[in-house]
């Protein structure tokens, strides 16, 4: 890696201070989303990259993500998260299954990586203005934590129905929380209004090159922690795409034989449709999970990267997801949020569809976070048990499926 850095980093000159600094240790919703985009793909490229140093752009104008990942600032605040073997599941599936434990981050989510990397690359002369973002929880906590570390005022707009555990943690971390609107699109509109009125700096939860590169450091860590020889596939939540795009673009450059598998809930099909077709797709109705965390469409930059790096997308049901939550607990005694547990559910389904006699093959699932509202633990455990015995139920003891979107935020 040192050799690579010597090749790609420009020589010291008068402009060198404007370049992203290399971390001393650099030798990743349910993913956030918004359904509304006003930009075409080309204009998106120009907008996202207009303030990026030329040395970090490829000849075609797109970001050089390998260089951005290698020079990421995330290790100012995060440590390399462990790869935890899940022995019972491995024995059951006949292969080696590992969890990448992003739930062990300071804010219990991979989102800290992207938020901090973006904010650490802001011009220090502008930071006094403060930052603003919109989120259902995990990105909000990442921004609030980063803002405290970097001493930048932060305003976070969250939907009114955001679980208490989310907005209270954001406030505890020092963020100024505004609860506004019924969904993330409404919160996004309010954040944009505040940005214009108060001249704040926007920290988007998705589709920003520095955010994607921050999440891509997860892929870099994987290849530090495990030999790529037997690594057959890495599974992560498809969502709006910044996580899988960042991990995928690094792994495909360094270990191109590794399959990148996205996992998505059965109802939100925007990601699957976008991957299967040539057009960028936005669904009119994302279905049951639309309150806070539904993915109506992948981010535009993430969608572009999808086409290059993602092998396939597996769909799983809510009951399969809750069953995987129980599997993880039995192996690790950790409660992973359903947005992270669905990845293991997808891994299990993929193994059943792709059997192999090779017991040395290694599969990695990205456990993206552990921000679960305590009040929903009962629903998770009961649904997991029912999924095992009876195949699911519409309503359990008065807790209906209408509450499920908040489990996935």
Curated annotation (Swiss-Prot):
Any Pfam family: PALP
Keywords: Lyase, Pyridoxal phosphate, Virulence
EC number(s) recorded for this UniProt protein: 4.3.1.-
Cofactor: pyridoxal 5'-phosphate
Annotated residues for binding of pyridoxal 5'-phosphate: 138, 239-243, 368
Family note: Belongs to the serine/threonine dehydratase family.
Name of the featured protein: Threonine dehydratase-like protein AKTS1-1
Source species of the chain: Alternaria alternata
């Amino acid at each position: 890696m040192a050799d690579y850095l010597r090749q790609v980093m420009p020589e010291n000159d008068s402009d060198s201070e404007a370049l992203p600094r290399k971390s001393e240790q650099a030798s990743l919703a349910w993913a956030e989303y918004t359904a509304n985009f006003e930009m075409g793909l080309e204009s998106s490229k120009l907008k996202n990259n207009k303030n990026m140093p030329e040395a970090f752009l490829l000849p075609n104008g797109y970001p050089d993500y390998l260089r951005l990942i290698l020079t990421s600032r995330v290790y100012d605040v995060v440590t390399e998260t462990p790869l935890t073997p899940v022995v019972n599941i491995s024995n059951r599936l006949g292969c080696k299954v590992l969890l990448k434990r992003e739930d062990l981050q300071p804010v219990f989510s991979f989102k800290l990586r992207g938020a901090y990397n973006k904010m650490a690359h802001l011009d220090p002369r502008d930071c006094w203005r403060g930052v603003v973002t919109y989120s259902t929880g995990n990105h909000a906590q990442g921004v609030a934590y980063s803002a405290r570390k970097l001493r930048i005022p932060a305003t976070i707009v969250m939907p009114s129905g955001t679980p208490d555990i989310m907005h209270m943690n954001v406030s505890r971390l020092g963020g100024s929380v505004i609860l506004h609107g019924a969904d993330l699109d409404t919160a996004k509109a309010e954040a944009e209004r505040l940005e214009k009125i108060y001249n704040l700096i926007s920290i988007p939860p998705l589709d920003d090159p520095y955010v994607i590169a921050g999440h891509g450091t997860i892929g870099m860590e994987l290849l530090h922690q495990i030999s790529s020889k037997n690594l057959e596939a890495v599974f992560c939540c498809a969502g709006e795409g910044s996580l899988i795009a960042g991990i995928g673009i690094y792994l495909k450059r360094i270990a191109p034989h590794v399959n990148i598998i996205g996992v998505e809930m059965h109802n939100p099909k925007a990601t699957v449709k976008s991957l299967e077709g040539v057009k960028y797709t936005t669904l009119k109705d994302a279905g049951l999970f639309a309150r806070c965390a539904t993915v109506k469409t992948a981010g535009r930059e993430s969608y572009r990267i999808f086409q290059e790096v993602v092998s396939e997308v597996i769909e799983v049901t809510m009951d399969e997801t809750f069953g995987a939550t129980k599997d993880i607990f039995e192996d690790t005694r950790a409660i992973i949020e359903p947005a992270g547990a669905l990845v293991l559910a997808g891994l299990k389904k993929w193994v059943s569809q792709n059997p192999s006699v090779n017991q040395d093959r290694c599969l990695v699932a990205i456990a993206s976070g552990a921000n679960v509202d305590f009040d929903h633990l009962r629903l998770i455990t009961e649904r997991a048990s029912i999924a095992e015995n009876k195949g699911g139920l519409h309503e359990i003891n008065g807790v209906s499926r209408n509450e499920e979107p908040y489990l996935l935020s």
